[in-house]
């Protein structure tokens, strides 16, 4: 039987906008260490600091597989998306809003999948996690329940208990935001035919910002607004002086 050498990523070409987003967000920059199971996802190693470079084509291929798995579930609300990291909470919440999944953020209470006595117990069909190390309790319980697990994994993360590993830098707020943003776009593209690269500025909604950074952004915005008002006022005064009617000026 002849082998089909067609790559999964060839079915949906990665848009240039997504390539730029992955690079700008440093999604392709892994750690300095790696394991054997992750070696197939590596593009190379940066000589000056020994940073492992993740192959963007491998990331795209796994994002497509993850999106197909998601679309195979009839009720999206039965898919649990977990992130215990602070900067992973906003991307998870925005992702779930976009695709209809159930977010579980903050501390993952042991027994949330396995103990019916827990105050809020979940019975998901699929699990998605942002980090196999930080979310290891959720992955452990998913193994007890035989839940298919999708995970964003870095170069030194364990792949034990993971069915679909999406190779990506999961220790950067911008990278994890880009990952969930692109995955949500792929899911909606497969389900409804929505454009992949419509309004790329929406990725900002997935990005976590701490209070200090938000204050700086507000101050910068206020300065820009003030400068623009002053410039407009100055131009208006100058234009009025240059084109004013003599009778109007004399009336004062």
UniProtKB/Swiss-Prot annotation:
- State whether keyword Ribosomal protein applies: yes
Organism for this UniProt entry: Encephalitozoon cuniculi (strain GB-M1) (Microsporidian parasite)
**Sample GO molecular function, one term:** structural constituent of ribosome
Give one GO biological process term.
ribosomal small subunit assembly
**Gene encoding the protein:** RPS0
Which Gene3D superfamilies does the UniProt entry name for this protein?
Answer: Glucose-6-phosphate isomerase like protein, domain 1
The Swiss-Prot or TrEMBL record describes its family as follows:
Belongs to the universal ribosomal protein uS2 family.
Function comment: Required for the assembly and/or stability of the 40S ribosomal subunit. Required for the processing of the 20S rRNA-precursor to mature 18S rRNA in a late step of the maturation of 40S ribosomal subunits.
Q: Where is this gene product found?
A: Cytoplasm
| Listed SUPFAM superfamilies | Ribosomal protein S2
Q: Quaternary structure?
A: Component of the small ribosomal subunit. Mature ribosomes consist of a small (40S) and a large (60S) subunit. The 40S subunit contains about 33 different proteins and 1 molecule of RNA (18S). The 60S subunit contains about 49 different proteins and 3 molecules of RNA (25S, 5.8S and 5S). Interacts with RPS21.
- Gene Ontology cellular component? cytosolic small ribosomal subunit
Q: What is this protein called?
A: Small ribosomal subunit protein uS2
**HAMAP family, sorted:** Ribosomal_S2_euk
Which of UniProt's keywords are assigned here? Cytoplasm, Ribonucleoprotein, Ribosomal protein
Specify where it is mainly localized.
Answer: cytoplasm
Pfam name, any one:
Ribosomal_S2
